[in-house]
């Protein structure tokens, strides 16, 4: 049995991300078999007891994750040139939506410290729908990190044009983009003008390129689900907290 970095053990235990673990080690908030770990890169056996002190656990519990229904014309990431408006600018108390349809409406205060709130994944400027922003490295890891390989992302895509049954089969499995063979997708007609796409990967403008290859023009693209979390009745431009009952 080999030793591994304590930061990796903490991440595997779901207590924090590796980056967060390193910060807690620097602050003296990590214990190994009851003793404070004071050196980055310290290794241990998985059979040893690795834990976070109360202050670190509290800090983790205070980290926010929000679901935003991003409108078209907003970018998902920060723009250093300030040429475009970032979606994070919509995370304001005025845009907060606490749906009464949720089993347990959030008790979190919509006025919260947004430091470190970053998008977990991207959504094109000309696409709308579900965008996750989080302060929690564990959530980011689930959506865009090592654990994201099996996370489904569902989209409603308004298209113009007609395709054959063989074209539809090609969209489901068989397309190569930029010399890369895409993973199988689930693509079905929602109605005569709209396709439903379910992907387990998210390459740059993937859906638009897939549609273009079979002669379809995309007139609108909206993400409605990531993993087990759905956009549901969240209005465009509004946001809510990820509830305690939800997990990706």
Region annotations inferred by a language model:
Residues 2-248:
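Basic, flexible Lys/Arg- and Gly-enriched helix-loop patches that mediate nucleic-acid binding at interfaces
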